[in-house]
């Protein structure tokens, strides 16, 4: 039970940091590919 209760406290910040990083990386690659800037 202790591992299950401590799982969200590790999983939520991980998703909160990894997901925006992947979104920014894919967005920057898309901008470089289309060469808007």
Curated annotation (Swiss-Prot):
Its membrane topology: Single-pass membrane protein
GO biological process annotation, one example: photosynthesis
Cellular component GO terms held in the UniProt record: chloroplast thylakoid membrane; photosystem I
Matches recorded under Pfam families: PSI_8
Primary localization class, coarse: plastid
Cellular location(s): Plastid, Chloroplast thylakoid membrane
Keyword Ubl conjugation belongs to the record: no
Keywords: Chloroplast, Membrane, Photosynthesis, Photosystem I, Plastid, Thylakoid, Transmembrane, Transmembrane helix
Transmembrane segments: 10-30
Function description: May help in the organization of the PsaL subunit.
Family in the record: Belongs to the PsaI family.
PANTHER family: PHOTOSYSTEM I REACTION CENTER SUBUNIT VIII, PTHR35775
NCBIfam families: PS_I_psaI
Protein name as annotated: Photosystem I reaction center subunit VIII
Native source organism of the sequence: Gossypium hirsutum
């Amino acid at each position: 039970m202790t591992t299950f209760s401590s799982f969200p406290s590790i999983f939520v910040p991980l998703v909160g940091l990894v997901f925006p990083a992947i979104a920014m990386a894919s967005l920057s690659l898309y901008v470089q590919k289309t060469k808007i800037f």
